[in-house]
A protein has these predicted regions:
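Solvent-exposed loop/turn segments at secondary-structure junctions
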Residues: 1, 29-33, 56-58, 72-75, ...
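Membrane-embedded segments
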Residues: 1-49
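A conditional alpha-helix N-cap/helix-loop micro-motif detector
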Residues: 3-7, 95-96, 135-136
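Conserved beta-sheet core of the metallophosphoesterase superfamily
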Residues: 15, 100-179, 184
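Binuclear metal-dependent hydrolase catalytic cores centered on His/Asp/Glu-rich metal-binding motifs
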Residues: 40-54, 60-97, 103-104, 109, ...
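Short strand-coil-strand connectors
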Residues: 59-61, 149-150
Length: 185
């Protein structure tokens, strides 16, 4: 597809990152508009698992974490029911969703942690505030750790891309590594 030249080199680079339990992902709004099929094909080629309104289970030493991914979170007509609703509240569930707004706009019950991007950290920030932000909730879901009204924690990353113009000021690119630790009982 035209405009998708970045797909192969991006996923080839991501494939070099060693992930002992696998690599999973969800699509962004621009991915749906342009390169969806090529991204899915390339992810699978490199052994990565796209989660489009699907769940997968990571198991280790008798423990499990459930990953749930949201297909195009901007199409609430078709995707307005979170895949987490069918899961047990006893499980530890991580929700992968492109836009942070989804966890406020849709019930994401049974979610213990949500991971999102989309905002690019504001892309241009002045004194920590983004004058233009592609979230209905403004700077509340700009970057870092936030919570929805149900008190579900959400980590929003700046990511590595840009939108509209290829510029970033005060909102550096980032790839975030999250380490989970079991709480002492």
């Amino acid at each position: 597809q035209e405009g998708c030249e970045y797909v192969e080199p991006l996923f080839a680079a991501l494939a070099r990152v060693k992930t002992p339990m696998g690599t999973f992902g969800v699509m962004g709004n621009n991915d749906y508009e342009r390169c969806h099929d090529e991204i899915i094909r390339t992810m699978k080629h490199y052994g990565m698992r796209p989660l489009e309104h699907e769940v997968d289970t990571l198991r280790k030493d008798g423990q499990q974490i459930i990953l749930a991914g949201v297909r195009n979170p901007f199409d609430l007509t078709h995707n307005g029911v979170s895949p987490t609703l069918a899961l047990s509240p006893k499980d530890f569930v991580i929700l992968l969703v492109h836009t942070p707004d989804y966890i406020e706009d849709v019930s994401v019950a049974n979610t213990d942690l949500a991971l999102a991007g989309h905002t690019h950290g504001g892309q241009v920030r002045v004194f920590g505030v983004a004058p233009v932000l592609n979230s209905h909730y403004g700077n509340r879901f700009l970057t870092g750790l936030a919570y929805n009204t149900a008190k579900i924690p959400l980590i929003i990353t700046n990511g590595i891309g840009t939108s509209q113009l290829p510029i970033r000021i005060g909102a550096p690119t980032e790839v975030v590594m999250i380490t989970l630790h079991r709480l002492a009982e």
